[in-house]
């Protein structure tokens, strides 16, 4: 057999062994992007018992709405289509419900699931509630078939639990381009102890040889439609270069690992290994406030308000690399990676630092959160079977 034929067969085998989910993305104007609401959302997400400042939330979109990347799933028989945010920082699937009140604007502006129109759906009647900064997302639990993407290859059985939302809080989800949230964290943090859909996919060895999923995010500002891709059950070497550096999980709640160090121009900005959570559901990169302030000063950030720092757009090419050590390997963020360049509404651009200070008290913290600012530069692999997270340089990380 020639080498060319062997390579072709290998590529065909790889293609059949994994599922690819194309992601879409959305960008935001300076006016829409509010760090205060993002910070409150993350504290509500990661600090047990935290009572958010609702005024901060009402300044603008929450971090879920600022998250740029979402993709398709179907639910039910026949399939009902939804766009969902794939969130490694939570562990429940929920979509808007067909019977939500007429006055619930967020629900009415999105696709809604109707259990009565699905021959495979069972309405359990069990109540469901997730606390957000502007209130609670409330609904009931249904059981039905959930499929990744637009085909029926990677699907759960009809007993998969999901939340059908009848009430969505405040303005949090009104402007979101996605319909609901698809949690990809661990079942230990799942509301109502509902197992997530990936559990069933991982259990099906006929279609899933490796219990993992991977994110490749496109940060190309010139491509306004392609958001990237998620692969299920294997990695895709077309999306990264070099070896994957692995870091074991600290605990099976979030995708929590140890960050060894953060270094700029030879100066270390962290003191020893510190917990970090890899979160596809947040757009920023956060760390302890005292450390982030030093980083902002180093990159010439000008403090504004609510933790925002502005940087002159013209200085991006000369900004220093910021090096994160994970899994024994260094990962360099360049200025173009950690500066958010967005329209200011006047035909120009405003550049904001993608770093945000946030203090999370013990025992949950101190903590770094590696959001899309980091994941957009580095191919990120979430290995459920081996309880670890891996990173490699994205082939087109921009």
UniProtKB/Swiss-Prot annotation:
Glycans are attached at residue 321. The active site is at 87, 279. The keyword Cytoplasm applies. Residues 18-55 form a propeptide. It comes from the Eukaryota. Disruption phenotype: RNAi-mediated knockdown prevents neuronal degeneration in a mec-4(u231), deg-1(u38) or gsa-1(Q227L) gain-of-function mutant background. Highly expressed in intestine and to a lower extent in body wall muscles, hypodermis and neurons. It is found in: Cytoplasm; Lysosome; Secreted. GO terms for biological process: apoptotic process; programmed necrotic cell death; proteolysis. The keyword Cytoplasm applies. Belongs to the peptidase A1 family. Aspartic protease. Part of the necrosis cell death pathway. Involved in neuronal cell degeneration. Involved in heat stress response. This is Aspartic protease 3.
């Amino acid at each position: 057999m020639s080498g060319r034929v062997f390579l072709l067969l290998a590529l065909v085998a790889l293609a059949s062994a994994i599922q690819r989910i194309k992601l879409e993305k959305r960008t935001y104007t300076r006016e829409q992007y509010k760090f205060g609401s993002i910070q409150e959302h993350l504290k509500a997400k990661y600090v047990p018992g935290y009572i958010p400042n609702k005024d901060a939330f009402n300044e603008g979109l929450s971090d879920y709405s600022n998250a740029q990347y979402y993709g398709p799933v179907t639910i039910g028989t026949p399939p009902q289509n939804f766009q969902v945010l794939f969130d490694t920082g939570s562990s429940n699937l929920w979509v808007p419900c067909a019977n939500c009140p007429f006055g619930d604007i967020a629900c009415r502006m999105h696709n809604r699931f109707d259990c009565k129109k699905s021959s495979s759906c069972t309405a359990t009647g069990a109540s469901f509630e997730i606390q957000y900064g502007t209130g609670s997302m409330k609904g009931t639990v249904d059981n039905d078939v959930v499929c990744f993407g637009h085909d029926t290859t990677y699907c759960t059985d009809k007993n998969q639990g999901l939340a059908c939302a009848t009430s969505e809080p405040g303005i949090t989800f009104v402007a979101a381009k996605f319909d609901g949230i698809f949690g990809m964290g661990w079942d230990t943090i799942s509301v109502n102890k509902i197992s997530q859909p990936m559990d069933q996919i991982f259990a099906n060895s006929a279609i899933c040889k490796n219990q993992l999923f991977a994110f490749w995010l496109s940060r190309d500002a010139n491509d306004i439609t392609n958001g990237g891709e998620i692969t299920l059950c294997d990695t895709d070497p077309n999306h990264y270069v070099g070896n994957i550096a692995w870091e074991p999980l600290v605990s099976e709640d979030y995708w929590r690992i140890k960050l060894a160090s953060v270094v700029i121009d030879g100066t270390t900005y962290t003191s020893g290994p510190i917990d970090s959570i890899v979160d596809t559901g947040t757009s920023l990169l956060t760390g302890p406030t005292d450390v982030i302030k030093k980083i902002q000063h180093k990159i010439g950030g000008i403090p504004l308000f609510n933790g925002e720092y502005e940087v002159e757009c013209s200085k991006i090419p000369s900004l220093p690399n910021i090096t994160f050590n994970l899994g024994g390997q260094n990962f360099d963020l360049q200025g173009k990676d950690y500066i958010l360049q967005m329209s200011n509404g006047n035909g120009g651009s405003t550049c904001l630092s993608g770093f945000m200070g946030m203090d999370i008290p013990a025992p949950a913290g101190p903590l770094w959160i590696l959001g899309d600012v980091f994941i957009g530069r580095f191919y990120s692999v979430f290995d459920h079977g081996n309880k670890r997270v891996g990173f490699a340089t994205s082939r087109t990380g921009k």
